[in-house]
Amino acid sequence: MCLVTGRAVAEPTAPAGSHSKVLSTNCSATANLTYENPPVLTGTIYRMGSTSGQPLFKFKRTATRSGNRIHVLREFSYPDGKLAARERVVYQDNALVHYELDELQIGARGTADVEQSANRNKAKIHFHYSKDASTYSSTAAKTEPLLLDTLINDMVGPFLAAHWDQLAHGEKVGCRFIIVPRRETVGFTFRKESETQWHGRDVLILRMEPSSMLISALVNSLHFVIEKNPPHRVLEYSGRTTPKLSSSGHWTDLDAVTVFDW
């Protein structure tokens, strides 16, 4: 998962009474787009409870812009440089268009493609996923409606910054999260857990937990260390990450700590 950067993909008009800060998807060619910065972001992934031992993986996010389209490459590598997992993301203006997951450790591949519509209620997400990448092209699509504040991991950081005032005042903020291996979105809620200092910086600790009790049994709560001063960057993230860990000859989901190099 490795949550780093976030904002919603939806029409630019929120429902009446909504607190959502929806970003306009109609941007000029010279406007700064939400997901184009930083051009390069790196991080290190450690075992839970230790950020000083041997790293498990290295993370690198690279963003390039062509007109109003942003292409993002997210790579997860072993310390020796070998790729463990790769994600590709495409945004048009500030809206998600395409998300692709290559789980190179287990040979799986999946995608989520957004079909926008002038009628926001008719926008859709099309999912494909195969445990065998060689059979990916023959997998059947699974489709669900695109709801407001639907995110992928790359969109979480900006999403939290956009809802900073609510979170800082103790309000809960909800989202739908795209999980390609499940070919669906899952509801999550963010809330402030505490305020503290992190390496001399004033920070908030935010907790992200599934809205469903069923999903809560499968995924532990996730935690974000976010600087209190603008631009409210995610400094550290603890929870489910994209690469897996080999244990007794089997690949298992990995909960880990990711420290970002801001």
Where are the regions a protein language model picked out?
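Acidic, serine/threonine-rich low-complexity disordered tracts
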Residues: P12-D93, Y99-A118, K172-W262
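Solvent-exposed helix/loop surface patches that form functional interfaces
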Residues: E36-P38, K122-D202
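Bacterial N-terminal signal peptides
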Residues: M1-V4
